[in-house]
């Protein structure tokens, strides 16, 4: 289906309204959670995009958001507008743009911490503190487990990768061994 609407326009409109209402920071966590739910749960995403589910039912869900937090009224109206105009396929993209705008204003960087094993909260706090000092921004850390790392960790922040793990070390050694001009093969 061809969509003539612009996700940037929707995101900017929501951002400007929240800024005007001074609700940018008070709604950030809720909207981020909603975005993550849509991104990770295909059933929820399909609900908003389904032509078989009526507008009233979708609008009811948007209204329920306001029950949790009165500052989300503009966001609920934003959802209803997208749904009413049959632009729900733009929802993820518009929210992604909106979140980037808000994170820029609030000086927030998102980081992924990928490790071979679960990392305790104390260590996460230390990592966040070090990253906040390095980047001079508030860090939102999301953790993932990747057994292929064997031990150690990898932190991804935008295009930056900080890694200390066995998998990366083994790949470097392998590349040296296989490289004809490398140190080991002369």
From Swiss-Prot:
UniProt xrefs under InterPro entries: ATP_synth_OSCP/delta_N_sf (IPR026015), ATPase_OSCP/dsu (IPR000711)
Topology in membrane: Peripheral membrane protein
GO CC, any one term: plasma membrane
Molecular function via GO: proton-transporting ATP synthase activity, rotational mechanism
Annotated compartments: Cell membrane
A matching Pfam family: OSCP
NCBIfam families assigned to the protein according to its UniProt record, in alphabetical order: ATP_synt_delta (TIGR01145)
Function: F(1)F(0) ATP synthase produces ATP from ADP in the presence of a proton or sodium gradient. F-type ATPases consist of two structural domains, F(1) containing the extramembraneous catalytic core and F(0) containing the membrane proton channel, linked together by a central stalk and a peripheral stalk. During catalysis, ATP synthesis in the catalytic domain of F(1) is coupled via a rotary mechanism of the central stalk subunits to proton translocation. This protein is part of the stalk that links CF(0) to CF(1). It either transmits conformational changes from CF(0) to CF(1) or is implicated in proton conduction.
Name the record gives this protein: ATP synthase subunit delta
């Amino acid at each position: 289906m061809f969509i003539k609407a612009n996700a940037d326009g929707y995101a900017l409109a929501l951002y400007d309204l929240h800024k005007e209402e001074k609700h940018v920071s008070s709604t950030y966590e809720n909207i981020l959670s909603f975005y993550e739910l849509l991104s990770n749960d295909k059933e929820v995403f399909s609900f908003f995009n389904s032509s078989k589910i009526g507008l009233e039912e979708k609008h009811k869900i948007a209204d329920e958001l306001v029950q949790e937090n009165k500052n989300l009224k503009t966001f609920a109206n934003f959802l209803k507008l997208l749904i009413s105009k049959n632009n729900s396929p733009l929802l993820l993209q518009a929210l992604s743009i909106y979140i980037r705008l808000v994170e820029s204003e609030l000086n927030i960087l998102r980081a992924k911490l990928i490790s071979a094993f679960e990392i305790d909260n104390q260590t996460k706090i230390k990592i966040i503190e070090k990253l906040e000092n390095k980047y001079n921004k508030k860090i939102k850390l999301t953790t993932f487990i990747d057994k292929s790392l064997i031990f150690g960790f990898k932190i991804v922040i935008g295009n930056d990768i900080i890694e200390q793990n066995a998998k990366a070390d083994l790949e470097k050694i392998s590349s040296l061994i296989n490289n004809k001009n490398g140190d080991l093969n002369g």
